Amino acid sequence: MEIEEDLNLKILEDVKKLYLQSFDYIKNGISSSLPSDKKFLADDDIDLSRITFLYKFISVNPTLLLINEKTQAKRRIFQGEYLYGKKKIQFNIIAKNLEIERELIQFFKKPYQCYIMHNVQVFQMLNKNKNNNVVEFMDSEDLQSSVDCQLYYLIDESSHVLEDDSMDFISTLTRLSDSFNSNEFVFETNYSIQISQMPKPLNTTHFKLLQPKVVNSFEGVILQVQEGKNILQIEELIDQVYLNSRRDRFYILKVANGKNYMDFIEVYLVYDNEDQEAKQQLQFYLKPFQRILIFQSLKHFTKNLKLFMISFFYSSGVQPNNSNVKNFLVSHKGVEFFSRFDIQKNELLCKDLIKSYNKLPLSNISKLLEDEGVMIRSNMKFQVRVKKVKYFKIRLNCLNCKQEWTVGLKNCINCKGQQSYISYNIQVLVQDQHFLEQQAYIYLYDDLAAQFFNITESEKKELHLHLTKNETFIQLYYSFNKDYPLSIIKFKDKIFNKDITNCIVAYPFADIDNKIFNSQQQIIQDENLRIESEKFIQNFTEDNNLQESKLYYEKFKSKNKQQIFVNGTYISTNYSQGQKICLKPIPCLKVMYVFPQEDIKLSALKIIEEINQLKIQIDQLN
């Protein structure tokens, strides 16, 4: 098709806006898969000719019919144009069956929608009858034998990596256009927008990018679940919502994270925020899921497009083990801030967020923490009530030198370190059960971190009383090292009369199965080996610049408990029992060792050796 120089400027401008809005989120992923001469550079001018991932539907005419001479089946034609730079390619879409057609009619009601299609087939349109708007077309079985026209989806929204096959899309379309001597094609979708019609396995992305002018904001939920038995719960929930509501009310976006589709799946239920009935229905069907972690909000696709998301923790302790999906957000009454996310993948987003969140009025933060007091109590394991926020600050720090990190840089300016973490400095006024107001410094952390504190009821009371007398400073750091995402917890105080100066915990491994362990103990009584182990740990600490976080046996001198932090792994010993177990189902606490006598010394080298063996086994399984 000839290039149209007089392309409608408004449409071009719309596409450019959409592209600019999504550019920051996808440029790194696209660059990794494009040929070297087409890689994006951070300061590149936007070249519209590089847009290979948007289908632009300029016009839809559902009154135009297709007819199959063999079956006499009639299908509506959805006319559209694919915009590639300044080149405009016309095409048509037909549905494979009436159910899909109804979904498409609802989907194409709104103008200027950009939609990414998957696993589509190109048809040659034959013998177009201009009088009665009827077009004959071949069956897909006949066509496949004569034309190589299988195409794959262009982009996976979650990983932002273009599939290799998609790079040939334009050349394929152009080649077909030249060979057919026609500007029109039919794209047949193999599944509908309805989630139940999506093909198995769940390795496709269904993603819709909306113009801000069309929809001011959307609401929805995100269901996060690992592939396995719990996916059935998600499917049942989706089916319930669909069976009991108008199907055109909800848009379904199902995302398989990254290239390892067995790792993690996100299911988005998106609906118009003005549709109160849809909101109520969704809330009704979410009631059975009692373990809702946090209510979330994400401004991701456009400035005016909001997806309100809920993360679900199931009783089995499902937790994503991919650092790229640790994007937890907290939202309440318009107050939004990140609880945890991958800085390296979201540098620009991080920069904007830190600027905006640090400008939030303290009254809003105070209201947030006050209303979410239950959450804080359950996480912190003591009974306090936030009364007022006196100070709030979120910033990036270097994990090595602890100095503030310049957003956008890959290395720390001060020490050239490569790991950064987000810190939340929130000074609050808390109120205990006796209504004694005391000042406390609390660095927020989520329920995962709380699991590191194996606090009994009696200890909880002791900690509770302690808070009424002294200031307690608790700080949680998250780093984003790919192999060892360490969580460093620092206590600058004595909690329930125990010195906890520094300790280090982490969850770098995939879930460990119980059967890997057995009840036979490897009891190390050699004093020389014990000394060698402690020396190894000390050297490890110095080599890894962890002077502030001494890596050694950290003992809790309470009753019969001892907790050890070795090589970034949380290990608990309990002398009241006699078998060694792996703590499940909480994935972040990887290994629990239980021994019969308190005077037994466990070798750190042995622990590290077992952990490394487990890592090898896990890598082999993956």
Curated annotation (Swiss-Prot):
Main location: nucleus
This protein's GO CC annotations: chromosome, telomeric region; telomerase holoenzyme complex
Annotated localization: Chromosome, Telomere
Keyword list, A-Z: Chromosome, Telomere
Domain of life: Eukaryota
Effect of inactivating the gene: Telomere shortening without affecting the accumulation of TER or TERT.
Keyword NAD in record: no
UniProt keyword annotation of Cytoplasm present: no
Described function: Component of a CST-like subcomplex of the holoenzyme telomerase ribonucleoprotein complex, which stimulates telomerase complementary-strand synthesis. Telomerase is an essential ribonucleoprotein enzyme that copies new telomeric repeats onto chromosome ends by repetitively synthesizing the short telomere-repeat sequence 5'-TTGGGG-3' using an RNA template component TER. The CST-like subcomplex (also named 7-4-1) binds telomeric single-stranded DNA and coordinates telomere G-strand and C-strand synthesis.
SUBUNIT field: Component of the telomerase holoenzyme complex, composed of the catalytic core (the catalytic subunit TERT, the telomerase RNA template component TER and TAP65/p65), which is associated with two heterotrimeric subcomplexes: (i) the replication protein A (RPA)-related subcomplex, composed of TEB1, RPA2/TEB2 and RPA3/TEB3 and (ii) the CST-like subcomplex, composed of TAP75/p75, TAP45/p45 and TAP19/p19. TEB1 and the CST-like subcomplex are tethered to the catalytic core by TAP50/p50.
Protein name as it appears in the record: Telomerase-associated protein of 75 kDa
Organism for this UniProt entry: Tetrahymena thermophila (strain SB210)
